[in-house]
Amino acid sequence: MNCVCRLVLVVLSLWPDTAVAPGPPPGSPRASPDPRAELDSTVLLTRSLLEDTRQLTIQLKDKFPADGDHNLDSLPTLAMSAGALGALQLPSVLTRLRADLLSYLRHVQWLRRAMGSSLKTLEPELGTLQTRLDRLLRRLQLLMSRLALPQLPPDPPAPPLAPPSSTWGGIRAAHAILGGLHLTLDWAVRGLLLLKTRL
């Protein structure tokens, strides 16, 4: 039996190419991800978050009705009007969208801490909203990296948000945050879909 094994090894050594299965050629480049596919994924996440925000806004209005417009000075202003969509450029859109969503993430975190038991019935939904907002921000950062856009410097520490003066003030702040986030996400979906046609 040992003689047979040695004979097999000798024969294989005479044809080394047959002893090892061929592998991929060395140094073969990996296919780079398609930016349009990355943008599609970002749009899907943005649409999903838009729907989450819409549903949560409806729940907030049902549980805590508050007529009229509600503003919060610390919230970002809407990035662009619908009429100016044609002049958008991808780098500026992604940069501004990321900055605005970071602000909204901070406000949602503040709302969950500041309101406590007042918004307890909406806490699961607010927690889900915060998680998905963070996921979209990570997706935007990945998209900017894949498109080789300039890396942004770290954001300076934002001043802490003051606690609401009353429960009613907190409820008005919740309406302002969700309403502003809904408008921002709606604008983002429109802008990203338009910019996809230019890639």
Curated annotation (Swiss-Prot):
GO cellular component, one term: extracellular space
Location of the region described as Important for interaction with IL11RA and for the stimulation of cell proliferation in the Swiss-Prot/TrEMBL record: 182-190
Broad class of the protein's primary localization: secreted
Signal peptide: 1-21
Recorded GO MF terms: cytokine activity; growth factor activity
Pfam family, one: IL11
Localization in the cell: Secreted
Family: Belongs to the IL-6 superfamily.
UniProt protein name: Interleukin-11
Natural source organism: Macaca fascicularis
Native organism taxonomy: Eukaryota, Metazoa, Chordata, Craniata, Vertebrata
